[in-house]
């Protein structure tokens, strides 16, 4: 098979294989499986929406099957001599979990965010407040923005002013998170507990120096590997690099033979291929994908690979939503064949399928059986007793039948 010119089917199979959809492990999921998956996909995006399950848990389930979520919690938000912390939070894509070993690869971004990611002027103009927040965290240990604010009010009761409200304490703490001076020690519920970064990150990692150029080169290399192949725009998006960073990095990797430049039929830009990635001959991969799954989080690539137009509709008023509030694309044998609007009702013990829709040209009855199986597995994983099917969409009837007739 020529590797210099690929059709979209080949590109799609490469992308799915690179993202680790080979099938769940034969044994129960362990910390070693999690470590291997992170080294492959690099990031687990964090998001506050928990209508079905929080976003960072879902890509692990989609690739490895049911697992104990405390495995991921412990990897990200706890540390002991026996089980050292594996993951750390940072702006790796959006807010995301990434390998703690890769912290030094983000130093250039921390310098860029020296005064935070947002409200930079406010942070820049209030250096004394920055120092006070750092001193508060040093004194308190792991703490929320609210606890920092309460501490500062106690320590300086006469200093009440426009700054002393929760949101601005939060701005400062978030700015210090972005600049790498604070990090997340743990989360309780989903509330972030800040700590001084050097107290969370092992000294050998914290002190490791990586030049900006070397870091960007390595991130580009990792993005190509995680994607399998992608255009410059796809690769750039994975770690949210700038155009001025990605162009020289890709050129250097092509020159070194670490990345192959290829043409994909119908794409109007060249693609870059991981030379270690074989081209699968068979379409594989069946999974429900959360909206922030790395396979689909860059929507233009999803359209090119799958001919699948996808937009999250959380912020769309309910009457104007086409498919639903929190819609999971359904990957069946390497094709995106449908969409499922899911909601977990924990009080009732049900996983509610609010709506289920087949893509144009797809047979709803062919989708229903494998979808029922995945939904039942997901419900069990989330500790829910059953799947309840609503009324919206052309897949709900055959799905209801499939759920009743198979066990």
List each language-model region with its residue ranges:
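Long, charged, low-complexity, helical-prone intrinsically disordered regions
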Residues: 1-407
């Amino acid at each position: 098979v020529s590797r210099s010119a690929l059709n979209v089917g080949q590109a799609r199979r490469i992308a799915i294989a690179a993202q680790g959809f080979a099938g769940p492990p034969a044994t129960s999921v362990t910390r070693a499986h999690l470590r291997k998956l992170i080294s492959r996909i690099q990031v687990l995006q964090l998001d506050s929406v928990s209508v079905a399950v929080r976003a960072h848990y879902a890509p692990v389930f989609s690739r490895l099957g049911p697992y104990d979520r405390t495995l991921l919690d412990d990897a990200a938000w706890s540390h002991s001599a026996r089980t050292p912390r594996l993951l750390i939070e940072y702006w790796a894509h959006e807010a995301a979990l990434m390998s703690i070993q890769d912290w030094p690869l983000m130093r250039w971004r921390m310098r860029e965010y020296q005064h935070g990611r947002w409200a930079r002027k406010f942070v820049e103009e209030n250096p004394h407040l920055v120092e006070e927040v750092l001193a508060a965290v040093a004194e308190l240990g792991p703490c929320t923005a609210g606890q920092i604010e309460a501490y500062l009010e106690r320590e300086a009761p006469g200093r009440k002013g426009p700054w002393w409200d929760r949101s601005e304490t939060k701005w400062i703490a978030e700015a210090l998170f972005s600049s790498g001076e604070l990090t997340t020690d743990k989360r309780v519920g989903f509330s972030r507990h800040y700590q001084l970064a050097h107290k969370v990150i092992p000294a050998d990692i914290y002190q490791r120096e990586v030049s900006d150029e070397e870091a960007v080169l390595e991130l580009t290399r990792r993005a190509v590997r995680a994607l399998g192949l992608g255009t410059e725009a796809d690769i750039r998006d994975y770690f949210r690099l700038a155009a001025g960073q990605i162009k020289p990095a890709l050129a250097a990797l092509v020159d070194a033979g670490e990345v192959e430049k290829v043409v994909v039929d119908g794409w109007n830009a060249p693609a870059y291929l991981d030379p270690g990635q074989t081209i699968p001959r068979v379409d594989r991969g069946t999974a429900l994908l959360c909206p922030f799954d790395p396979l689909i989080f860059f929507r233009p690539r999803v359209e090119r690979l799958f001919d699948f137009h996808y937009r999250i509709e959380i912020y769309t008023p309910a009457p104007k939503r086409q498919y639903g509030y929190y819609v999971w694309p359904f990957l069946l044998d390497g094709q995106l064949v449908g969409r499922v609007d899911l909601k977990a009702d924990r009080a009732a013990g049900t996983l509610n399928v609010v709506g289920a829709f087949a893509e144009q040209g797809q047979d709803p009855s062919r989708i229903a059986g494998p979808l029922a199986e995945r939904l039942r597995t997901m419900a069990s994983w989330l500790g829910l007793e059953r799947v309840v099917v609503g009324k919206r969409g052309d897949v709900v009837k055959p799905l209801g039948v499939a759920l009743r007739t198979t066990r």
